[in-house]
Amino acid sequence: QGHLYATDVDPIEMEKTRARLASAGFGPELLTIQHRNFADVDQVAPGVLFDFVLADLGVSSMQIDDPARGFTFKQDGPLDLRLDPSSGVTAAERLRQLDQEELENLLAENSDEPYADRIAKAVIQVFRRGGTVDTTRQLYALIEGALSFLPAGERKEAVKKSCQRTFQALRIDVNSEFEVLYAFLEKLPHVLKPGGRAAILTFHSGEDRLVKQAFRQQYREGLYSDIAQEVTRPSPQECRRNPRAHSTKLRWAVRAE
């Protein structure tokens, strides 16, 4: 009989998952859930090599739909964006730490935001006037104002997309998501059994690029015997059932024997 190990950096969602799976019959003899970042995959079960590792890099719908977590600009809430609300600085605090050039670079590098310069300037101007950017709707209003130069017919969609990219960029920074993913990818082949498999679900191009590069490099080094040459995407039917699956990409790798 196998054993399932699961980790979640979010202690709130972790407990919900534990209760949900326990009600489905997954007791402690079958399931171990740890409050742990997957960058520490080598500490999940020291000395154990896994048959299969699945990493889901996305923010959950439960996190997005809770305005108190600050992941959405569609409802007002604190500008938090931390996956683990018990540690680290909030997105609001992070904004106050950055100068205009640093914020512009963050938006450009983490989410390819085309209006990074205008948004960064708008945020810093608020701080210079003694104002605050502490809530999700305050940031939304700033982005809306920064893009007011666009023609009215284009503005609504442009503001929506820039908000999505800006919140993504801040979330990546606040949670050190690229650094965490890099650490996980470096350790991954060393926790798999010979012939063991790994599958990783990504939700934006920056994540997918890191996974693709790591798998290819480790394949060349002989750590993997086979890797996905192309991403697997959700079917149109799945996207209709779950619109948030639309951006999902899956890549896999097989540990060398």
Located regions from the model:
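S-adenosyl-L-methionine-dependent methyltransferase catalytic core, i.e., the SAM/SAH-binding region
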Residues: 1-257
